[in-house]
Amino acid sequence: MGIKVYKPTTNGRRNMTSLDFAEITTSTPEKSLLVSLKNKAGRNNNGRITVRHQGGGHKRHYRLIDFKRNKDGVEAVVKTIEYDPNRTANIALVHYTDGVKAYIIAPKGLEVGQRIVSGPDADIKVGNALPLANIPVGTVIHNIELKPGKGAELVRAAGASAQVLGQEGKYVLVRLQSGEVRMILGTCRATIGTVGNEQQSLINLGKAGRNRWKGVRPTVRGSVMNPNDHPHGGGEGKAPVGRKAPSTPWGKPALGLKTRNKKAKSDKLIVRRRNEK
């Protein structure tokens, strides 16, 4: 998918880029796989803001994505490549030979008319899903499960990929996009290939309004707030923080504080941290 560059006809258009959607084959989604989405604007069931900077934006339907890929031995044909407003990756509509329709994350190189299949005996081909134990060392994968049968949780964003490094007993060593090397059960499934739409990260929005269309509201700095709104607020002019370390709006340490649970059981499955060289 290429990038479209706009002429600087206005200040908002200067340096603006967008995808040309050349890979998209239809603009009409499969109706049976759509679910309505209510705009919650970052509020919980009490109406209180639990996630800041959310609200507005274009209305969306949620596309039901098959992250489990558990229809073993049943072949599917790729019918369309579609845009999904709920994620950075594109999605593909597949029709199984038993009549079932499903959406999957569209990997790079997947084309309309291509046949894909899931199961331990599937070929090592883009779009096929297999247990990690059946995938050869060095294979590039995405859509990785962490618990067998739960559905893919890792490597689902546009352009993301991971690589199989080896096998240790019932676990498979996988190097993730971040550089972290992690042990994952060999019975967990993954899909062959890299997630498509890899140029999505190169897009320059050009103006704040495009973020608003996506439902993202402005982020206000704490230093320009009043002292009753933020620990950094108040003072005359550009005042310093006035604390030993920067704080969140709720007074907790910000910037650099480790937030991972020190007793996390998954620590023993992480062979190398993402920030280790």
Curated annotation (Swiss-Prot):
Protein keywords: Ribonucleoprotein, Ribosomal protein, RNA-binding, rRNA-binding
Region (Disordered): 222-277
Keyword Transcription regulation listed: no
A family per Pfam: Ribosomal_L2
Assembly mode: Part of the 50S ribosomal subunit. Forms a bridge to the 30S subunit in the 70S ribosome.
Function: One of the primary rRNA binding proteins. Required for association of the 30S and 50S subunits to form the 70S ribosome, for tRNA binding and peptide bond formation. It has been suggested to have peptidyltransferase activity; this is somewhat controversial. Makes several contacts with the 16S rRNA in the 70S ribosome.
The name this protein goes by in its record: Large ribosomal subunit protein uL2
